[in-house]
Amino acid sequence: MHEMSITQNVVEICEKSAEGRRILAVVLEIGELSGVVPEAVEFCFEACTAGTLAEGARLAIDRVPGRGECGNCATVFPVRTYFDPCPACGAYGVRVVAGEELRVKELEVE
């Protein structure tokens, strides 16, 4: 489960940003195409925050839907996988424009 190490890294990033202040809430953005399972991050969060400035912090996850842009006709459309064809022209040269995110969006500290 790589979500454990990802969650540990998120906590480290939050602690550095908090500059010694207690962390009350963390909001993450996780894209549907990121390969990260939000439920697994939620499961790991409590264990990863134990004994840190983020212990007891609330975690919210904003899920970012996948979107792609067709390289052939420039149509922007929802994608669920990297292999979705363009619904307008059927081409497979799709550039992902959203859904790969994995970032700390907000941090609430004391």
Swiss-Prot record:
Binding site for Ni(2+): 2
Entry GO MF terms: nickel cation binding; zinc ion binding
Signal peptide positions (record): none
Family annotation (PROSITE patterns): HYPA
Key words of the record: Metal-binding, Nickel, Zinc
Positions annotated to bind Zn(2+): 70, 73, 86, 89
One Gene Ontology biological process: protein modification process
Record Pfam families: HypA (PF01155)
InterPro entries: Hydgase_Ni_incorp_HypA/HybF_CS (IPR020538), HypA/HybF (IPR000688)
Family to which the UniProt record says this protein belongs: Belongs to the HypA/HybF family.
Reported function: Involved in the maturation of [NiFe] hydrogenases. Required for nickel insertion into the metal center of the hydrogenase.
Protein name: Hydrogenase maturation factor HypA
Protein source organism: Geobacter sulfurreducens (strain ATCC 51573 / DSM 12127 / PCA)
